[in-house]
Amino acid sequence: MKAATAPLFNAIADGPPKAHGYWLTTKDNLRIRVGHWRSDAAHGTIFLCPGRTEYIEKYGKSARRLVENGFDVLAIDWRGQGLSERLHKDTLLGHVSEFSKYQIDLDTVMDWAESAKLPGPWFILGHSMGGCISLRALHKHERFLAAAFTGPMWGINVVTLTRSAAWLIAKTGTLMGLGTLYTPSTKAESYCATADFEGNTLTNDRAMWEYMRQQLIEHPELQLGGPSLRWFHRALRETRQLARLPSPKQPCLCFLGSNEQVVDVERIKNRMAAWANGELVIIEPGEHEVLMEAPKVYNSILDRICTHFDTHQSKTMLSRDDAESKGENRQT
């Protein structure tokens, strides 16, 4: 699969030194960006799926820790955000026509990773909206050996509206052709670039807040504002559909901040209670972005994720060796 060189601002990312950005073209002819941080002795690849408004560079520090643990890392700019192709003339509008389009983005990155012969096995790590996309992907693909999530968007915390009212506004606005209007209470500005640290819903750590804020100030082309009504409606619909599905068979480790205010906490708890080989870990104290808390916190989370992936890689290898041994015994 063809790929062209794309910018990756590793100076603001503070990521591992072996960093490369690539442009990929999806099957519906959109240009998206992928970032690849390479380990010298990788024993697997982690597909890092960011949330809404996010971009590759935001996960530089996370990638550094994952690479130190022996993994290659692929981070994705979803269509409509980061440096990937924007979908509306108002480039600050967070918009998508259907959530299934994000699966096209992920499929494109997987195809490229296959053609580039990135090391297996493959794992998936999804945050917020990326957690929603990743959960859908686990139902579609056998390729991912295990999964991890942080603050996954398996439901949206509708603060100022009841859920039924939120559905009504989102659906009616979309049907009336108003799908590209901003969702009520949101606007055409980046939250992290404009909000104050005090009272923010993302992190308790001021240094990490400034890390994110400075990235957006130095590269304003990475900024994204509020979601469109259509995005909001499609997000409500996708999370409802996912909630009705059984849990995937892959092992899962999920982290949730104790003061989560962005996504639906009950949806996460219900999902993890029904995930046979899943574990939910509450980070105390923690906001929505637990990987953007203090270094001691996020490094501990990332180390635990790597142990989770390594453990299930080892179990798979042992099972495979045992199956091969039994097959040889049958032949003798």
What are these regions (language model features)?
Residues 94-114:
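Alpha/beta-hydrolase active-site loop
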Residues 56, 63-89:
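Conserved alpha/beta-hydrolase
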Residues 1-25, 30-37:
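An N-terminal hydrophobic leader/cap segment in hydrolases
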Residues 248, 254-256:
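Short beta-strand/loop motif that positions the catalytic acidic residue
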Residues 250, 264-273:
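Short alpha-helix in the alpha/beta-hydrolase fold that links the catalytic acid
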Residues 279, 283-332:
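Catalytic active-site module of serine/aspartate enzymes centered on a nucleophile-bearing elbow/loop
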Residues 259-263:
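Acidic catalytic loop of the alpha/beta-hydrolase fold
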Residues 129, 133-219:
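Alpha/beta-hydrolase-fold enzymes
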